[in-house]
From Swiss-Prot:
InterPro entries membership: rRNA_ssu_MeTfrase_G, SAM-dependent_MTases_sf
Subcellular location: Cytoplasm
Gene Ontology cellular component terms for the protein in this record: cytosol
Superkingdom of the organism of origin: Bacteria
GO MF terms, alphabetically ordered: rRNA (guanine-N7-)-methyltransferase activity
EC number, as in UniProt: 2.1.1.-
Binding site for S-adenosyl-L-methionine: G73, F78, I124, E125, R137
A Pfam match: GidB
Protein name (record): Ribosomal RNA small subunit methyltransferase G
SUPFAM superfamilies reported for this sequence: S-adenosyl-L-methionine-dependent methyltransferases
Function: Specifically methylates the N7 position of a guanine in 16S rRNA.
Length: 212
């Protein structure tokens, strides 16, 4: 059943990676009994609401080796951990201000033998490392997110696509747009035909392209 959902939407995934996704679920299930890392309700739909949701980035973006990605407000390690398993030559920096979550993520990194993931217990306001892409999942309203992270971008692009923000959100988008920037909006339901994704959006903001 678990393998089937990945084979349906991501048929090119290696079986060894799928096994690690299953292991990731088991780790979360174990620790969630003691610490509320993700909601218990979403744990019942773990592969759909956490893994598939994270992997929708992979449908659009391919990160080249040695790219640097910052995952802001990573929570239980999403979308950073699933993407780090796919792009194992890309550097992922996962940040969250809640120490207990960071401790669990460190354990996950060890259990999954991830060599390309680094964690920091801090707020993005106080974090000044530079990167190619910043990922967030329903952290705050998009204009506020842009304001918080724009200091963290490298100006020189490394990938075929421009450096930018990769943001997963639900609900409306038009009232959050900043007309200074170029956005590409993807309806996740177009490539993940699950009811959960009906109103979910993937927003790609191209950081170093401004509309004057």
């Amino acid at each position: 059943m678990k393998e089937r959902i990945f084979n349906k939407y991501f048929p090119d995934l290696d079986k060894s990676i799928i096994k690690k996704f299953i292991k990731l679920y088991k780790i979360h299930k174990f620790f969630n009994k003691k610490i509320n890392i993700i909601s218990n309700n979403s744990l019942n739909f773990f592969y759909e609401r956490h893994i598939l949701h994270s992997l929708c980035v992979y449908k659009i973006c391919y990160f080249l080796n040695k790219s640097i990605i910052i995952d802001v407000g990573t929570g239980g390690g999403f979308p950073g951990i699933p993407l780090a398993l796919l792009f194992n030559k890309t550097k992922f920096i996962l940040i969250d201000s809640i120490e207990k979550k960071i401790k669990i993520i460190n354990l996950i990194i060890k259990e999954l033998h991830l060599k390309n993931v680094y964690v920091k217990c801090t707020r993005i306001e106080n974090f000044h490392n530079k990167c190619n892409f910043i990922i967030g999942r329903a952290v705050t309203k998009l204009p506020n997110f842009i304001r918080l992270v724009k200091k963290n971008f490298l100006f020189k692009k490394k990938n075929k696509i421009n450096n930018g923000i990769l943001y997963l959100k639900g609900g409306e988008f038009e009232n959050e747009k900043n007309n200074q920037y170029l956005y590409i909006k993807y309806n996740i339901y177009n490539f993940l035909k699950k009811f959960f994704f009906k109103k979910k959006l993937f927003i790609f903001l191209l950081f170093n392209i401004k509309i004057i």
